[in-house]
């Protein structure tokens, strides 16, 4: 998947090990998925699954999972809706000549994500958790990565203050997710 872990299955497994993979009872059919890949529409089509984890001030990062793509439940008082405490990154998954899926320098994305979080008083996501969340989703939704050389699959890691709280302070509860957009 990355230049450092692609040829080392043990390293990749170690990164994805903390993530529980939940069943998806309604994935896109092969035919539907292929038709969506063949006609890219950036930001309008999403893959079958997403990664999700939570952070609380008392417990830190927990509940690492790959789950079916679905709307997020959010309290109307969530801090992100009132104070815009949110950050995101973007990276692309592409099909390598040998059929494997690779990402370009995801460690650099992880470092930028940490810096963005720090500036917004959000908790810094450990680099291994960032890489593990992306790797777990790549493994689960590998069939969404196009085989045509000119196409890639865009991945969007994002974090937001999900705690229902109106006031100015660092959040006590945060959600982090990675979803995959259509081919670009």
Regions found by a protein language model. Give the residues of each.
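Conserved alpha/beta cores of soluble small-molecule-handling proteins
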Residues: 1-184
């Amino acid at each position: 998947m990355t230049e450092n872990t692609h040829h080392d299955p043990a390293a990749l497994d170690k990164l994805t090990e903390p993530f529980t993979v939940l069943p998806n009872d309604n994935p896109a059919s092969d035919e539907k998925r292929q038709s969506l890949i063949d006609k890219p529409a950036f930001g309008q089509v999403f893959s079958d699954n997403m990664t999700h984890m939570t952070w609380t001030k008392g417990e830190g990062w927990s509940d690492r999972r790959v789950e079916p793509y679905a709307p997020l439940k959010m309290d109307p008082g969530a801090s992100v809706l009132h104070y815009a405490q949110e950050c995101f990154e973007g990276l692309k998954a592409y099909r390598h000549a040998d059929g494997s899926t690779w990402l370009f320098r995801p460690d650099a994305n992880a470092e930028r994500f940490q810096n963005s979080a720090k500036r917004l008083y959000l908790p810094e996501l450990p680099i291994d958790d960032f890489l593990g969340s992306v790797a777990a989703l790549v493994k689960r939704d590998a069939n969404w990565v196009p085989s045509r050389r000119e196409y890639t699959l865009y991945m969007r890691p994002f974090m937001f203050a999900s705690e229902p709280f109106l006031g100015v302070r660092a959040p006590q509860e945060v959600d982090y997710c990675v979803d995959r957009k259509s081919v670009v």
